[in-house]
UniProtKB/Swiss-Prot annotation:
Its cofactor is Mg(2+). Endonuclease that specifically degrades the RNA of RNA-DNA hybrids. PANTHER family: RIBONUCLEASE H1. Mg(2+) 2 binds at D14, D138. PROSITE patterns: RNASE_H_1. Keywords: Cytoplasm, Endonuclease, Hydrolase, Magnesium, Metal-binding, Nuclease. It comes from the Bacteria. This is Ribonuclease H. Residues 5-146 form the RNase H type-1 domain. One of its GO terms (biological process) is DNA replication, removal of RNA primer. It catalyses: Endonucleolytic cleavage to 5'-phosphomonoester. InterPro entries: RNase_H, RNaseH-like_sf, RNaseH_domain, RNaseH_sf, RNaseHI. CDD domains: RNase_HI_prokaryote_like.
């Protein structure tokens, strides 16, 4: 008997921070066919990188079943971290190549766990360059920031 086909979900994420650290917010758009869901949240105090990570984590944790995911972020920190750096961090006990503890390790570990049920393809786009979904994710992140001032 064949495995049921996994749904294909498209996700766009963004984070925002007023001051770094300062109040911050994150936003995410999840799209499955014609169904679209928007998520947002925030923290105070926080950093922009933490909000970028939390946007991706929150979107992936919102998925109710295993999916094939195309996740688009404007954060090189998130994309490089999850597609390149994380493998050595894990091998080195969550330490960088110069033996320092990985920054935001709590969120990197949470993102690593959130990925497990899914097949995720990571995409990067330039922020604030007129990409409609990225602009909307940015608006959601700013709303999340405003709610956490």
């Amino acid at each position: 008997m064949s495995e049921p086909q996994r749904p294909h979900v498209v996700i766009f994420t963004d984070g925002a921070c007023s001051g770094n650290p300062g109040p911050g917010g994150w936003g995410a758009i999840l799209r499955f066919g014609e169904i679209e869901k928007e998520l947002k949240g925030g923290e105070n105090p926080t950093t922009n990188n933490r909000m970028e990570l939390l946007a991706a984590i929150s979107a992936l944790e919102a998925l109710k079943r295993s999916a094939i995911v195309d996740l688009t972020t404007d954060s090189q920190y998130v994309r490089q971290g999850i597609t390149s750096w994380i493998f050595n961090w894990k091998k080195n006990g969550w330490r960088t190549s110069d033996k320092k503890p990985v920054k935001n390790v709590d969120l990197w570990q949470r993102l690593d766990a959130a990925l497990k049920p899914h097949e995720v393809r990571w995409h990067w786009i330039k922020g604030h360059a007129g990409h409609a979904e990225n602009e909307r994710a940015d608006e959601l992140a700013r709303e999340g920031l405003a709610e956490n001032r």
